[in-house]
From Swiss-Prot:
Protein name: Cbb3-type cytochrome c oxidase subunit FixP
Similarity remark: Belongs to the CcoP / FixP family.
Upper taxonomic lineage: Bacteria, Pseudomonadati, Pseudomonadota, Alphaproteobacteria, Hyphomicrobiales
Cofactors that this protein relies on: heme c
Residue ranges that the UniProt entry lists as topological domain Cytoplasmic: 1-33
Organism from which the protein derives: Sinorhizobium medicae (strain WSM419)
Length: 289
């Protein structure tokens, strides 16, 4: 029921609203005036903002507002200004080779910065944000190169990819499956020999036999010293860097059913100048030759 007479709460000393429900009275604590005025001010500001700036969505576009402001247009102006500022460097990158770009400190710095951004968008998904790679994806920070670490060699690999079916200049190599060519004993012997090149093998008595099997079946690609062949994309087996896993069982698995990674050809997607920037960036990571 409503109480027409003012009532002051005995505990708090605050006047009640005059309403009572089941013996419970509501204290009359109005909002502070500054809060009320601030609330009114935000309403007025919101109305002014809606009139001045784009705000109300229509069927095809939002209302433009009396000021005609457009954040999209502002970004367009900033992008145009950035492109204009970079135009000189971009032109020089397009005209010069990767080696010439690296030899020019200003161009090299610009290309490394631009290449790092491109790498994060297009390459980090496989090679990692720090270019350290992972199982099946080469580490680009070290000096272990399948196809060569010179600037133009890196450019060639990025531009045309690895085993990219539609690119006639792609890097290509294929390790045959030895599961039907060698006996399990021979593969075990070969794995023991390969592991002995970088660490103590678990079965040292198999090393000499494995060395002979390696010479007969593997040396034609990996070399008599097992240090690989960049022209063929055959990895160095004597440096303790493993692309598809470490250990004798991983070596045997690769011999039986080889894994062949594929890297897309980036030249059609990114264009020559951007591929050059990527090549300069990868070369700068520490393993470039």
């Amino acid at each position: 029921m409503a109480d027409k007479h003012k009532h002051v709460d005995e505990v708090s000393g605050v006047e009640t609203t005059g309403h009572e429900w089941d013996g419970i009275r509501e204290l009359n604590n109005p909002l502070p005036r500054w809060w009320v005025y601030s609330f009114y001010a935000t309403i007025i500001w919101a109305i002014g903002y809606a009139v001045a700036y784009p705000s109300w969505p229509m069927l095809t576009e939002a209302t433009k507002g009396v000021l005609g402001y457009s954040s999209r247009a502002e970004v367009g102006v900033e992008l145009a200004a950035a492109k204009a500022a970079q135009a000189g460097n971009l032109e020089q990158i397009a005209l010069n080779s990767v080696e010439e770009i690296i030899a020019n400190p200003q161009l090299q710095q610009f290309a490394v910065s631009a290449g790092a951004s491109v790498f994060k968008v297009n390459c980090a998904q496989c090679h990692g944000s720090g270019a350290a790679g992972g199982q099946g994806f080469p580490n680009l920070n070290d000096d272990d190169w399948l196809w060569g670490g010179k600037p133009q060699e890196i450019y060639q690999t990025i531009a045309h990819g690895v085993r990219h079916a539609t690119d006639g200049e792609t890097r290509g190599s294929e390790m045959p499956p030895f599961g039907d060519m060698l006996t399990p004993e021979q593969m075990q012997q070969t794995a023991a020999y390969v592991m002995s090149l970088t660490q103590a093998p678990s079965q040292p008595h198999l090393v000499e036999q494995g060395k002979q099997v390696f010479a007969d079946n593997c040396a034609s690609c990996h070399g008599a010293d097992a240090k690989g062949n960049r022209e063929m994309g055959a990895p160095n087996l004597a440096d303790a860097i493993w692309l598809y896993g470490e250990g004798e069982q991983a070596v045997i698995a690769q011999m039986k059913t080889p894994k062949h990674g594929v890297m897309p050809a980036w030249l059609p997607r990114l264009g020559d100048p951007v591929v050059k920037e990527l090549a300069v960036f990868v070369h700068s990571l520490g393993g470039g030759e």
